[in-house]
Amino acid sequence: MKRVLMLLALVLAPSLPARAAPPETPVLTLDEALRIARTNHPQLQAARAQTEASAARVGMARAPLLPQLSGNASYTRSSGKASSATSTGLSVPLSSGNSYSLGVNASQLLYDFGLGTGKYKAAQATLGAQEQTERNLAVHVAFNLRSAYYTAAAARALLKVAEETLHNRELHLRQIQAFVEVGKRPEIDLVQSRTDRANAQVQLIQAQVAYDTDRALLNQAMGVERDIRYDVVAPPAQALQGEDGDTVSLLEVALSARPDVMALARQIDAQELSTRSIRGGYAPSLSASAGVSENANQLDSWQLGWNARLLLSWQLFGGGITDGQVRESRASTAALRAQYELLRQQVRVDVEQARLAVRAAKAAIAAAHEAAQNARVRLTLAEGRYQAGVGNVIELSDSQVALTSALAQEVQAIFTLDLARARLLRAIGQL
């Protein structure tokens, strides 16, 4: 009977639906994360809106320099009464009627000694500064994204270390349990192994929570709300161009490419142009205007008229307000120049720190990799010694702890190099 059931099961097995394989966890690449952040991050959206507003202010500053054209149309109905009485003692209307008017007027500023053109050029320079400010924010968003991505990738690598540690602890537990059952090892070895496995389980839970948390922070760095059920894998390490160069060459690149440096330089230009514009208030302005109009009391009796005017306007005394505005603008320019020098010094520090951090991290990776290899060999030797009966459970446990620590240090070394290169990118103003 059992044989019949077994044959029936073999016959029916191919017809049974196969269990669907679990879907693979999607992988979010660094390039994709950067693209999402550049498109969706709220800070960048706000910066783009501010740039659009600055561009609109350029148009507003240009408007007074262009011809101004206006039109008007009016209709008036009027009536009046005499001030003297008639023979009947009553006042009677003297006049009443309609009035129609149509007109077009044009005006043009001819010259104002740089008052209007200075405001326009200052607005253009301010727009340039805002564009660089937007780019500088994009550089910082990219750095924060890389930092969050590399942190999540390191957390995933540490999760793999925790999984390997738990797997090794379970293997050791089964081996030790078998030795204890046959009397080759004391009961205390089994208790120690169970404790080590429990600790490994706790470490695995903590590593999983850390990975989940870092993916949530990565979502925030991308500026999106999305599920965290995806994996991140750090791309292969690639050296940055010039990362092994000296500080002087990297500093030249940074000063010519960093958007915060260029933004402050444009702010200085805008302030100087604003000063020139204010000084135009000392001089007169010359404008011209002309108009054409038609007036009528009846719709069939229009009369054409025109006018033209040249206007020279000059504020002879304004209580010293122009002097005060000029002094204020010059002081603001001096303050911006001081900030510019301070920023140049900070750029040098940023470049120096990032360059040294990259060099130190590259050296640490080789040492961390060697330490991990030695720790793995040590664990293999400890396992062999324990199975041969010449080692003890403490030696075995310590070897596993040493391997876990060495693997974690290797992950940390890789993360440190990735983050150092990200800082160097930010220091030289690269996206």
Identify the role of each PLM range.
Residues 99-101, 147, 192-195, 305-307, ...:
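Transmembrane beta-barrel architecture of outer-membrane proteins
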Residues 29, 68-136, 257, 262-343, ...:
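Small/polar-residue-enriched beta-strand and adjacent coil segments characteristic
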Residues 19-23, 79, 226, 407-431:
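Acidic, low-complexity, intrinsically disordered peripheral segments
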Residues 6-15:
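Bacterial N-terminal signal peptides
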Residues 20-74, 109-110, 226, 232-268, ...:
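Bacterial Sec-pathway N-terminal export signals of envelope proteins
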Residues 46-61, 137, 141-162, 171-174, ...:
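Amphipathic alpha-helical coiled-coil segments
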Residues 124, 187-195, 393-401:
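Short, charged, amphipathic alpha-helical segments
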Residues 137-253, 354-357, 361, 410:
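Periplasmic alpha-helical coiled-coil/stalk elements that build and connect Gram-negative outer-membrane
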